[in-house]
Amino acid sequence: MGLLDGISHLTDLRALTPDQLDELAAELRDLIVSTVSRTGGHLAPNLGVVELTLALHYVFRAPDDRIVWDVGHQCYVHKILTGRKSQFHTLRQFEGLSGFPNRNESEYDCFGTGHSSTSISAALGMALARDLSGEDRNVVAVIGDGALSGGMAFEALNQAGHLGCRLIVVLNDNEMSIARNVGAMARYLSRLRTDPMYSRSKDEVESLLRRIPAIGPRVLGWIERIKDSLKYLVVAGMLFEELGFTYLGPIDGHNIPAMLNVFRQAQAVEGPVLVHVLTKKGKGYAPAEKNPDKFHGVGPFDPATGNTPTDARVSFTEVFGRTLVQLAEADSRILAITAAMTSGTGLGPFSRRFPQRFFDVGIAEQHAVTLAAGLAVEGYRPVVAIYSTFLQRAYDQVLHDVCLQKLPVVFALDRGGIVGEDGVTHQGVFDFSFLRPVPNLVMMAPKDENEFQHMLKTAVEHEGPIAVRYPRGTGTGCALDQDLVALPIGRAEVLREGDDITLIAIGNMVPTAVKAAEILAERGIEASVVNARFVKPLDEKCICHYARRTGRLITLEENVIAGGFGSAVQELLVAKGLTDVRVQLIGLPDVFIEHGAPHLLRAKYGLTVDRVVRTAESEKRKRARLKLAPRLLR
């Protein structure tokens, strides 16, 4: 029986001696690797924070003390220790544990996260609320060096330092993005700063010197000038000192006694304090240590080797990367921009082939969009590759800096629609709705990976802002054309003719419509199928033609219904006076979509062939009753 078997709650953790925590850390790593190998998830980030999380929960008293996890990629140990060990096997599964902190799941998840760089702002708000209420608790924000590149984090640091609020920020530095400290003197000064005697001794010495007649103030000034010169040897720490934080570190994030010591010291600091902790991403699992980027977020894998199952089909992301390289070979104006997602957006091949035309701006989506606008002004064709959910963070820049000026910026929106196991914070189900109202913007969504290639060709040749939205995962396995052509803007594609009802689908719902039409034909209902291709502008002529022809429409989209593609079709019919046409909208309801396998989520929310078939059959029965009603009246 291991130590972990006896851990059900934080009280069990605190009953252990500090010497037992390293053994517990090893057991936690084994559990995480075993579980994530089956469920998928964020492996390397969690392996890197095992000791850090143990130390935090050993010193701080959650839930009374607040611990906010930035992004949430690294919350697995936290979940195991806070009463959810028995559920950990359900991680990221439908109706199981979320892969991110979730306030609805546990009182220990004091703030929900999923997007980056929010923790310090939230923690500062909690700290201010504590002070306003006259309460006494610690508030801790845990943020990675990658997330610290987000502007919002610096905005929060700036105000926290200005206010002098008692707040602890733990910088989990696992990539050495912040410069290494320089030389022996820097290490010495760092050791001084981690000693609680340092601040007290400094104040006592200053007080003593000020009381010495004549020479005291001069000596004090001389010491201050030396200190000001030396302190800039501690490159990273001085940035935070200048912002008003007490800087403690750097600390070995896998040395539990050192972290227990520094966290206790941080509790004693009056005012904001930043604890700089150095960790190794993927720690304790050789494949993840060797390739932490690959194991940042993974699907199921063989824990013995780290190998993942292969799929002969290519993903939409891979098609994007290949196609953009192909297009850029022929057009030197094409540039690629990503916000810290080079691999995730498929831009690895582009970055290697065209390093001078590739820009990774870090976690700075707003900057990425306006950077693209500036490049477009000067005649380039920038392609901003970004997950749908993260474009939400740059909405004003899309409107104000790109679309208002009608600049030729391409938005390649990966992970559009239901993303799956990453859950509520990552589902890309709002983009149709928030982009459709924007003037000057064209928006497309492909039915398969081959059409996607042609849409990319269309996008880079368009003389204005344009977005193409595509799903996560593999495509249909269709053949890929070698020669690409630009599609006519706003032109739909008719895939099937029928007189009984029309199915108008967009994006990855088109194959669902085609399959449903085949089943309906077997049941005596002939359906027209239209691949809309464009959310904006709509093919008004095509839609109105089939509305008049069949009198019944079903729209299909993997987006919220409110303000989405189906709503656009309804608005068109009203504008054209076709108010007698019956329209049924199949899409997502007015809720945040939880985590789970995409096929289970689609089944729950009715984005299925069966739902389309049942809806069409119901419309046929209604039509039959309407035809019968006048006869009964006679």
UniProtKB/Swiss-Prot annotation:
A Pfam family it matches: Transketolase_C
GO cellular component: cytosol
Binding site for thiamine diphosphate: H73, G114, H115, S116, G146, A147, N174, Y285, E365
An MF annotation (GO) of this entry: thiamine pyrophosphate binding
Reaction catalysed by this enzyme: D-glyceraldehyde 3-phosphate + pyruvate + H(+) = 1-deoxy-D-xylulose 5-phosphate + CO2
Family of this protein: Belongs to the transketolase family. DXPS subfamily.
The protein's name: 1-deoxy-D-xylulose-5-phosphate synthase
Source organism per UniProt: Desulforudis audaxviator (strain MP104C)
Designated gene of the protein: dxs
